[in-house]
């Protein structure tokens, strides 16, 4: 594995490619996190994407430079974490297998079972203390730490979940066989 620094080349590609390549990466926020086991890609011409209708105050980070965080509030309840790729595209972090700061995650989430700590984008946000203040920050700097896998793990792929538009796109990726994904493939 290697630490991602300020080099944006990894993210300056199609979000579909980046979403697949993030599986198996280690990610932490202020030392709390784990291995990314599920992602979804969103593109600017994708009716399910926040960027589909253009730039707004809410999605401005999606149109900023690659390798930055895009944070949004889902259903007025959960902060969701995305990694910005090319302009108007991002990767939603849907699930993480907890590895570091598990007791902190348990306290934040109010649950004991490790599988339930980060299995879903809202749970990821709560467990990692994702907030609007992180929106637009570079992924190569504190409080973030992202280490990409040195070898490609076995992938599962399927249609995205929890959306009502462009549901046919097979842009959801996961670590094959992981029990930490939000939904089975």
From Swiss-Prot:
Enzyme Commission designation: 3.2.2.-
Family indicated by similarity: Belongs to the DNA glycosylase MPG family.
Single biological process term from Gene Ontology: base-excision repair
Protein name (record): Putative 3-methyladenine DNA glycosylase
Pfam families per record: Pur_DNA_glyco
A molecular function GO annotation: DNA binding
Keywords, comma-separated and alphabetical: DNA damage, DNA repair, Hydrolase, Plasmid
KW Heme (keyword) present: no
Keyword DNA repair among record annotations: yes
Record-linked InterPro entries: Formyl_transferase-like_C_sf, MPG, MPG_sf
UniProt-listed NCBIfam families: 3mg, PRK00802.1-3
Highest taxon of source: Bacteria
EC class of the enzyme, as a word: hydrolase
